[in-house]
């Protein structure tokens, strides 16, 4: 059976294409972010997995949760999550209503096909579609030591020039790399760490 990421791709593309055509890219990103957060919550996911609950009820519950706890910003925890995601709430009530109906139909389809568990992966793929449309890429950089401002700026400039896109760097530190960095952009990984070089040398010597 295909993995969740593979199964989620066509749903994410369909969602992004629809959102892009209807000028609701940010609104859909917000909806998918909240839905993914809910699916990742164990207590709520148990209810979503219950076959006795109808697809209509599940989709309505997810949209209602967004309506009451995010769009109205009544729930501070969800508001903080949305703000951290830099989501943009819809300003037009008419536009918001249209998006709500479309999202409800989308989630209902996933529920009927027993694929609500795909929502976190759908959200991640959706974000990638949006980034590509904006020519913006996420670069996940792991270094042996924290990068200095100069190192970060230089790396970002080089990646942007190489990829011909705006690059957002996400940093983490892993002392086991010994020195250097590893860079992951999409499915591509560049290992320029001392640990990686030592592993390559070991492989060559034992070949």
UniProtKB/Swiss-Prot annotation:
It is found in: Cell inner membrane. The keyword DNA-binding does not apply. It is a peripheral membrane protein. F-type ATPases have 2 components, F(1) - the catalytic core - and F(0) - the membrane proton channel. F(1) has five subunits: alpha(3), beta(3), gamma(1), delta(1), epsilon(1). F(0) has three main subunits: a(1), b(2) and c(10-14). The alpha and beta chains form an alternating ring which encloses part of the gamma chain. F(1) is attached to F(0) by a central stalk formed by the gamma and epsilon chains, while a peripheral stalk is formed by the delta and b chains. Belongs to the ATPase delta chain family. GO terms for cellular component: plasma membrane; proton-transporting ATP synthase complex. InterPro entries: ATP_synth_OSCP/delta_N_sf (IPR026015), ATPase_OSCP/d_CS (IPR020781), ATPase_OSCP/dsu (IPR000711). One of its GO terms (molecular function) is proton-transporting ATP synthase activity, rotational mechanism. It holds the Pfam family OSCP. This is ATP synthase subunit delta.
